[in-house]
Design a protein with these regions (language model features):
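Acidic, Ser/Thr/Gly/Pro-rich intrinsically disordered interaction regions
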Residues: 1-43, 91-288
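Nuclease catalytic cores
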Residues: 38-42, 46, 50-53, 74
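Alpha-helical repeat scaffolds in large eukaryotic proteins
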Residues: 46-60, 162, 236
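Short, solvent-exposed secondary-structure capping/transition elements
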Residues: 51-69, 170-175
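Short alpha-helical "patches" and their helix-cap loops
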Residues: 64-75, 250-260
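Long acidic/polar interaction regions in large eukaryotic complex-forming proteins
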Residues: 65-100, 105-106, 113
Length: 288
């Protein structure tokens, strides 16, 4: 989708060839191509966060007891999504600290941190994996803590995610905001909102309508989706070797391990737009 976004002219040319025609008049379908691709990128980012946390909680030890890594599919299928959403919310607001990733557990005849077990399983032996590697893993886990906190915060904005899941709730709305001097009516500040999406929230009890507008940040959405994918890769790929039959089939197979550091995650986490969230509300007031 990121490639499509940088080649919207080519995308539009393909769409033009397949546009509907009624009584000799073509119905244009390319007006919102860029909007649709960016909305899909945003939605895909939310899906990748949700997928990451499903694996994360499934593999997570419970009171020091490590789950059966060979039968993790059962845990995923029987996942309690409402409890997981609550855990994500707790990570986002700080009630659930990520320091537990530093706690030590016994696993495969090694004493390792939960973070090491989750993201670098099977690379515990100090004879096979030298001290430099072990230090890199510790630093990587510190970066992973920041990533998890960030994606939990992004995901905890449930109203936005729900709007994307029910696509009819997301729509282009405002083109710009202009702030004027109250006395002279001269423009002081203006913000371009042409590249944004809006969604509505209704508070029936308060008889209030809220329109939330968020500028698209496709570069960040793409990079953060890639980070989520790499975290999932680390959790799943090594386990397919440690607990699967790949080791017997491909004894000399080389596997890429992804180590994270503060520098490369900061570039992905940063926002690339000046305004991130705007809210407009209107409330029905009863006349006294």
């Amino acid at each position: 989708m990121n490639n499509l976004l940088s080649n919207t002219d080519k995308v539009n040319s393909v769409i033009n060839e397949n546009e509907l025609e009624y009584q000799g008049v073509k119905i244009p379908l390319t007006k919102n191509t860029k909007f649709i691709i960016q909305a899909d990128l945003r939605q895909n980012y939310f899906h990748s966060i949700e997928s990451f946390f499903e694996f994360f909680f499934a593999f997570l030890p419970n009171k020091g007891k490590v789950p059966d890594n060979r039968n993790i599919l059962r845990a995923l299928v029987k996942s309690n999504w409402s409890k997981n959403y609550k855990k994500i919310e707790y990570i986002a607001n700080g009630k659930m600290k990520l320091n537990f990733l530093d706690e030590m557990i016994d696993f495969l005849d090694h004493k390792v941190s939960i973070g090491h077990y989750l993201f670098y399983v099977g690379t515990f032996s100090k004879e096979k994996f030298n001290e430099e590697y072990q230090d890199s893993v510790k630093k990587s886990i510190e970066s992973i803590k920041k990533i998890i906190k960030t994606i939990a915060t992004d995901f905890s904005k449930r109203d936005e995610y729900n709007a994307y899941k029910h696509t009819m709730r997301v729509f282009p709305s405002f083109n710009s905001i202009h702030i004027l001097d109250a006395n002279t009516m001269e423009e002081q500040i203006n913000f371009d909102l042409s590249n944004s999406a809006s969604y509505q929230i209704y508070n029936d009890k308060e008889k209030e309508t809220i329109v939330k507008t968020k500028l698209f940040d496709p570069e960040r959405d793409f990079k953060m989706t890639r980070i989520c994918s790499r975290l999932i890769y680390n959790m799943v790929e090594l386990r397919s070797i440690v607990f699967g039959d790949r080791k017997e089939k491909n004894g000399n197979e080389k596997v890429a391990l992804i180590l994270f550091n503060q520098e490369n995650i900061e570039d992905s986490i940063k926002h690339n737009v000046k305004i991130q969230d705007l809210s407009f509300s209107s409330k029905l007031i009863k006349r006294q």
